[in-house]
Amino acid sequence: MARDFKLIFSISILLLLLDCCYGGKVGVCYGRSADDLPTPSKVVQLIQQHNIKYVRIYDYNSQVLKAFGNTSIELMIGVPNSDLNAFSQSQSNVDTWLKNSVLPYYPTTKITYITVGAESTDDPHINASSFVVPAMQNVLTALRKVGLSRRIKVSTTLSLGILSRSFPPSAGAFNSSYAYFLRPMLEFLAENKSPFMIDLYPYYAYRDSPNNVSLDYVLFESSSEVIDPNTGLLYKNMFDAQVDALYYALTALNFRTIKIMVTETGWPTKGSPKEKAAASSDNAETYNSNIIRHVVTNQGTPAKPGEAMNVYIFSLFNENRKAGLDSERNWGLFYPDQTSVYQLDFTGKSNGFHSNSSGTNSSGSSNSWCIASSKASERDLKGALDWACGPGNVDCTAIQPSQPCFQPDTLVSHASFVFNSYFQQNRATDVACSFGGAGVKVNKDPSYDKCIYITAGGNKTKATNATALTSSASTPRGNELLQWILKLCLMISLFFSLQTMNSQAL
């Protein structure tokens, strides 16, 4: 018995380690509100070509489900709002739906989530309290009957409008008018270990209030921080602030264990006249590139540092039949002919830079560098240097003893190298070289000897000290290697433990 306990304990520890090292996942939303899209089979080929492994669809279309068969792509399917009434009224209806519309394609098609309703609290035609939770329960019951309730998770997606307050994040609170719906929904999620699914769009905050919200702040490009006065936590982007507001709102209702999954986020490439300043290809490329890198490197949020999060980018294609402003039809990553609207690396491993050339704060180029200002005080330089090497996520290895940029061993020299690394990593924008006035842009390359000052457009492979560029990109690959090693250890442990148990039994 003691040996059996040790075996179980060892396996549990290994599984825990495996779970801890898994990184955040980036998926894409495959909406089909268009009359010019390629066939589902061609769409699947496109998705595979771009190494996309997680996809959300908004219904359970048979052609789409069949197309994803034998691909290993994890699929999130949806019960549309129009089906909620029927799903909430009859368990037999849901059992029949599962039998006829889902099970014929499972497990060949790797379905992992079912969303019951989409932003139903924003739909004037849906009574969320009457339909959503009962429909979720009926879907779960149907899954339990066929033994799939642990393999396919059930949830519903909501918008940020579910909050009555989102700033400061620590004051995040749910809208009391939804209390009758939220409590049973959250109890369902907690009991079944399902994620809280939210659609987040910092784009709208900037579009609707450009004079009060910084573009760099919503694009993950801000060199300054917004402080939460209640917690002292510092926020460099709006996405993290919105996610933490949700975590605090959940905590206020004593639902601390529920994980958050972002089922939609993105940025449009075109818009109506009122959206022209915000909606652009440059801004879309910058936002989506940065959110992907943010997720796969497990940065987490200030309130949940290092915590993995799954995020789905909206949307795969421009959808020409969507109603509303021009931007509604221009969120796509690809045109209907399957060419890219802009370049995007879904793995987050690319070392490339995506210059936000259309932004009002962007004037950087491959011929610009950022160095320490000769007018800056020692105190300001020291503070900016410490910040860049810490919260600023710059790899400062090159200025350590025996490294290429350690000499001359002066504060100005070290700060100059670090300032430039941060500047280039953050799209070489003017604000990325401010450092509270301690930084200044120059057009002459400050590189010397083997100390290479990188540029956004330069050849980074020749820079012997350009580790800051690759540190974030190497994290996912390092996690993959660690996962493989731990899995190998688990298999070896199981093999020898079973051998020992068999020999003792004999």
From Swiss-Prot:
The protein's Enzyme Commission number: 3.2.1.39
Molecular functions (GO terms): glucan endo-1,3-beta-D-glucosidase activity
Post-translational modification: Contains two additional disulfide bonds.
Active-site residues, record numbering mapped to chain: 119, 264
GO cellular component: extracellular region; plasma membrane; plastid; side of membrane
Principal cellular location given in the protein's record: secreted
Catalytic activity field: Hydrolysis of (1->3)-beta-D-glucosidic linkages in (1->3)-beta-D-glucans
Pfam family, one: X8
Proregion span(s): 472-506
Topology class, membrane: Lipid-anchor; GPI-anchor
Keyword Hydrolase set for record: yes
Positions annotated as glycosylated: 70, 127, 175, 212, 356, 361, 459, 465
SS bond partners: 370-433
GO biological process assignments: carbohydrate metabolic process; cell wall organization; defense response
Lipid attachment, kind GPI-anchor amidated serine: 471
Keywords of this entry: Cell membrane, Cell wall, Cell wall biogenesis/degradation, Disulfide bond, Glycoprotein, Glycosidase, GPI-anchor, Hydrolase, Lipoprotein, Membrane, Plant defense, Secreted, Signal
Places the protein is found: Secreted, Cell wall; Cell membrane
Record family assignment: Belongs to the glycosyl hydrolase 17 family.
Name the UniProt record assigns to this protein: Glucan endo-1,3-beta-glucosidase 13
